[in-house]
Amino acid sequence: MQPTMEAKHISSVWGIPVWRTASLAAFLWAFSARGLAQQQTPPEGPSTPSAKAPSSAPAEFAQARKLTQQGKLDEAIAELQSIESRDPSTKGLALEMGAAYYKKSDFPKAIEYLKKATKADPANSEATQLLGLSYYLGGHPAEAIPLLEKVQGWYSRANVDAAYILGICYIQTKNYDQARHAFAKMFDVPQDSAASYLFTARMLLRQEYDPVAEEYARKAVTLDPKLPLVHFLLGELYLFKSRVPEAIAEFQKELAINPGHAATYYKLADAYSRVQRFEEAERVLQRSIWLDATSTGPYILMGKVLEKKGEFDLAVRALQRAATMDPNNPTTHHLLGQAFRDMGKEEEAESELKLAEELQTKQNPR
């Protein structure tokens, strides 16, 4: 399994950083529940979904649900286990147990109980979708696919988050065309359009399926040479792979058709800075900032470029601006420390470098 760009140095489960699985599970829970609640047409099958809103939950589950809402998942599970010990056949218990373990990010246990829930009621959309998500988050995309496909097949307008997860599962099982179909549905564009290839290329790049991402982006260019953001994506890919001349060429092509895109100027400046074309980097960074003064990245890169040019006062001003916008970015303070040291201001340098180290330790505890 290849690591993702976002989690290159973080242990991951199928492209999801381990430290993020709990929050992602909660996020997907919230949106899957909302998506199911918004559906108007019941699924086809032997029965309608048996999942009920918390307000109509059986009395025996009320305490467990209250504990869950308070974030006391272990206590909620213990409460459900006491019900299980008294009567393992209690209707709806398997779904309650599976949902509790899902929220706890204990996906093997969630799968165990959610399989029971779907066996008892194959048309229970909540149990089916949670089981699919549990398989995905637990690192079993192949098992997740048929369940998420089933949920999508039940409804004319499937939950967007489920469509995204389904597309990622297709990528992880190397079924790229099916992934494209899922993302086309997610973004409401034709399956064979340039946009569908662009969206799929973006998702492939995020998962670091670089050769396929490049292939799909090139297909998008073939279908629509003036489609915005295709050359930007290719530029990002080449920059990530340190193919700097190719990255520069792609960013320049993007600006020719999309001259108001601030991020392209920023990425082009990054590419210029890597080959020490600092004057050009400074010029396009100014354009990026003029177009979007709310992003810290261009200010940070401007500080680095100006420091390389020996313009330390201006570098400090750019970096201080970035620090004002985002005081908790350790990179900004580290660069400020370097700039102050270049200026001979040792006291200010030590203060910034110490703060950078503290922020780095706080954000990445070992």
Report residues per predicted region.
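Terminal, low-structured helical/coil segments at or just beyond the last alpha-helical repeat
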Residues: 42-48, 331-366
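Alpha-helical segment of the N-proximal tetratricopeptide repeat
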Residues: 56-89, 99, 103, 168, ...
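Structural signature of tandem alpha-helical TPR/SEL1-like repeats
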Residues: 70-78, 104-116, 138-150, 173-185, ...
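Structural marker of alpha-solenoid helical repeat scaffolds
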Residues: 86, 120, 153-155, 188-189, ...
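Canonical tetratricopeptide repeat
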Residues: 96, 130, 164-165, 199, ...
